[in-house]
């Protein structure tokens, strides 16, 4: 069953990659065959097998030889790992937050933003599925405020913090923000960039916070 959960997760991760790739295009998310982004040739069925196809073909198109982004391999692997973690009783709220973080991170890496309607859809899901905390209301209001007024951090980042606040205490949220900021600054200095996608750092910090024992966090 563990392997089954992992395989299902890799398939779902592949779907998340498809969503991020086709969202701003006219191509259908649910219909139509995947194709090479360079030569537009349709991919064979065996080239669509998550993880394995990318290992065998070295993340290249079999016709034109263009290299595909390794982010798809990482997305499929991480999604498979999260689904496998359900077998070990990973809390569903943590699982749901991490899964949507994968998709939002992919959008953020590609374009430093994610679609507003996706953010609104996930917001509705959290309100429907989970109890709302006071800090969640505050962060949602702050996200709406920053959507219209630039304060140096994107509304999308704050909306992600809104999602995380459903499963973290105020103290854990502060630790998460400090850790993500430190990691982001280190990345900026090492890579000598002026701008970075912040949601991947928030997501990684979230994972660390939920895995660390409460005694260490305290």
How should each PLM-predicted stretch be described?
Residues 1-218:
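A membrane-topology feature that recognizes alpha-helical transmembrane segments
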């Amino acid at each position: 069953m563990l392997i089954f959960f992992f395989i299902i997760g890799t398939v779902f991760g592949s779907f998340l990659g498809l969503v991020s790739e086709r969202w701003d295009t006219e191509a259908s998310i649910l219909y139509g065959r995947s194709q090479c982004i360079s030569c537009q040739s349709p991919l064979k069925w065996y080239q669509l097998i998550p993880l394995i196809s990318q290992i065998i073909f070295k993340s290249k198109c079999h016709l034109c030889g263009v290299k595909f982004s390794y982010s798809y391999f990482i997305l499929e692997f991480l999604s498979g790992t999260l689904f496998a973690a359900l077998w070990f009783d990973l809390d569903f709220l943590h699982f749901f937050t991490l899964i949507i973080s994968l998709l939002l991170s992919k959008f953020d890496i590609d374009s430093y933003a994610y679609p507003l309607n996706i953010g609104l859809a996930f917001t509705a899901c959290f309100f429907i599925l989970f109890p709302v905390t006071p800090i969640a209301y505050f962060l949602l209001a702050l996200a709406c405020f920053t959507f219209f007024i630039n304060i140096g951090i994107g509304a999308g980042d704050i909306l992600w913090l809104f999602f995380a606040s459903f499963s973290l205490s105020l103290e854990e949220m502060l630790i998460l923000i400090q850790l993500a900021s430190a990691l982001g600054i280190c990345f900026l200095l090492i890579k000598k960039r002026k701008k970075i996608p912040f949601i991947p750092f928030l997501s990684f910090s979230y994972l660390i916070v939920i895995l660390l024992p409460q005694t260490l966090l305290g």
